[in-house]
A protein has these predicted regions:
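Short, polar N-cap/turn motifs at the start of nucleic acid-interacting alpha helices
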Residues: 12-15, 73, 91-93, 112-133, ...
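C-terminal catalytic core of Y-nucleophile DNA break-rejoin enzymes
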Residues: 25-45, 58-80
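A short, glycine-centered helix-capping/turn motif at helix boundaries
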Residues: 1-7, 27, 110-112, 123
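Alpha-helix N-cap/helix-start motif at helix boundaries, enriched for small hydrophobics
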Residues: 3-8, 35, 117
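Short, flexible helix/strand-to-coil boundary loops that buttress conserved ligand/catalytic motifs
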Residues: 9, 17, 24, 47, ...
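DNA/chromatin major-groove-contacting recognition/catalytic segments
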Residues: 33-34, 38, 135-152
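Short, basic (Lys/Arg/His-rich) helix/loop patches that form interaction surfaces
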Residues: 33, 78-119
């Protein structure tokens, strides 16, 4: 969630367990989110750059605003996401929320249990995850019809 990303602090990164601590996310709940090695590498590069240019306070916001005492706003994060997508050659309108949907869909296509996806997305109800994760067409093609298993 974009608001959760905006509120991340440097100290929320647990690189030894490859987790991000999300404090007071939606529903005012704390949770852990997975941290991919690729993302960790990118965040380390960002941290070195930000620290070298005095953009970040020790233990401060992972994505500080113009005043490092404040986090970067969600509008600025949205613009950064759109800019990165254009730089990557994506011609579709992509938002942080679109990336969240894609994350869930790719996990489903990779046959990750929906309850694990529920936890990763921070949903309290499985029904929310089921709505969120669009039915993956790749999975639909792999479903064997019960008619095909009958010995007629």
């Amino acid at each position: 969630r974009i608001g959760e990303v905006a509120m991340l602090k440097v100290t929320d990164i647990d690189s030894s367990r490859m987790l991000l601590r999300v404090e007071q996310g939606k529903g005012k709940k704390d949770r852990m989110a997975m941290l991919s090695p690729m993302l960790l590498s990118t965040l380390r590069q960002w941290y070195k750059h930000a620290k070298a240019h005095h953009l970040m306070l020790p233990g401060g916001w992972l994505f500080p605003g113009q005043n490092p005492l404040n986090p970067l706003g969600t509008r600025q994060l949205s613009r950064a996401c759109q800019s990165a997508c254009l730089d990557a050659g994506l011609n579709k309108k992509v938002s942080m929320h679109t990336l969240r949907h894609s994350f869930a869909t790719h996990l489903l296509e990779d046959k990750v249990d929906i309850r694990i996806i529920q936890t990763l997305l921070g949903h309290s109800k499985l029904e929310t995850t089921a709505l969120y994760a669009q039915v993956a067409s790749k999975l639909l093609r792999e479903v064997v019809s019960p008619l095909d298993t009958l010995a007629l």
